């Protein structure tokens, strides 16, 4: 029973270190869709993003996460009838479309636990002012949990706690919801993930059910333009779950010429995050380094995160195409 308790702690700890059961990325500012399904298609582009995160490099069994995401706006092209100054009618091109689609898959290994998951989202976009868009999104999700039993040694190879479900892997369906407000100057978003709090079977008898916690994210950013070619963007992200005390990221990013950016943020779970990146034609590359202020820093080389993304669509369409409704 003692051995059973220890391994259950390892398993559940891998699922929910400090209550965080979902992968956490430091570059969410550049792919808000990962934390809010309402973001899908909000800027009118079609984009794809690949991220890799190595946490606590040098520490055995540390989390390692990979994700691939994509999103798009379903656009319709047509013509709008307008009256010109001479009293005649003219047809002018317009771009329409209120529906966004998105999805992502991820793989996350944390100690003995291997997790894979997916999300498929649908979003709807409305105008509340001439340049302010309100988006709402709903997503279906699924998570697959599996113990890597090759890394576990038992005195009894038929250890009863490792039930057939864990040997094959456990699939947990769920859903996410998000609201997102976008303006050329600011963005605000609220989302909830794992809405249903589904239960995963993690063992036999009294240890069969482990509930997935509902997670909440509140995000906001604002853009100042001290010059015509530069922006300063303060941002904040508040994260909460039913088992995790609130955690916040507070950051500041400098953008030059819409081509280069560099930022610094502080995470209240005792970490400092530096990030920078650049764009080239329709591609952007970003890198983040997390320096933890906790004791584990003595045995690690920090956390590294790399993101590569590609975006399709007319560059002049951002914000401008939105005026064509």
PLM regions and their residue ranges:
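Sec-dependent N-terminal signal peptides
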Residues: 4-13
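Sec/Tat signal peptide C-region and signal peptidase I cleavage site
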Residues: 15-19
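Subset of outer-membrane beta-barrel
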Residues: 20-325
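Small side chains
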Residues: 13-14, 189
């Amino acid at each position: 029973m003692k051995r059973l308790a220890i391994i259950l702690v390892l398993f559940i700890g891998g699922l929910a270190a400090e209550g965080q059961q979902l992968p956490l990325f430091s570059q969410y500012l550049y792919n808000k869709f990962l934390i809010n399904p309402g973001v899908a298609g909000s800027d009118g582009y079609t984009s794809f993003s690949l991220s890799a995160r190595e946490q606590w490099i040098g520490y055995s069994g540390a989390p390692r996460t990979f994700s691939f995401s994509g999103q798009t706006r379903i656009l319709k092209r047509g013509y709008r009838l307008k009256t010109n100054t001479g009293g005649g009618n003219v047809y002018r091109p317009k771009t329409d479309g209120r529906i966004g689609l998105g999805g992502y898959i991820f793989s996350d290994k944390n100690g003995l636990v291997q997790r894979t998951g997916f999300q498929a989202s649908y979003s709807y976009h409305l105008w509340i002012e001439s340049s302010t868009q309100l988006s709402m999104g709903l997503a279906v999700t699924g998570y697959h949990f599996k113990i890597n039993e090759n890394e576990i040694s038992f005195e009894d190879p038929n250890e009863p706690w490792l039930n057939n479900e864990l040997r094959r892997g456990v699939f947990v369906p769920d859903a996410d919801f998000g609201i997102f407000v976008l303006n050329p100057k600011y963005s605000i978003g609220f989302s909830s993930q794992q809405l249903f709090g589904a239960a995963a079977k993690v063992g036999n008898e009294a240890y069969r059910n482990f509930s997935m916690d509902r997670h909440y994210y509140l995000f906001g950013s604002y853009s100042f333009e001290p010059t015509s070619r530069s922006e300063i963007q303060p941002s904040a992200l508040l994260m909460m779950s039913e088992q995790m005390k609130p955690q916040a990221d507070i950051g500041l990013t400098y953008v030059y010429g819409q081509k280069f950016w560099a930022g610094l943020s502080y995470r209240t779970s005792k970490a400092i995050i530096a990030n920078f990146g650049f764009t080239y034609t329709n591609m952007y590359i970003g890198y983040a380094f997390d320096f933890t202020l906790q004791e584990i820093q003595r045995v690690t080389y920090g956390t590294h995160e790399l993101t590569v993304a590609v975006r399709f669509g007319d560059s002049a369409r951002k914000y401008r195409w939105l005026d064509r409704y």
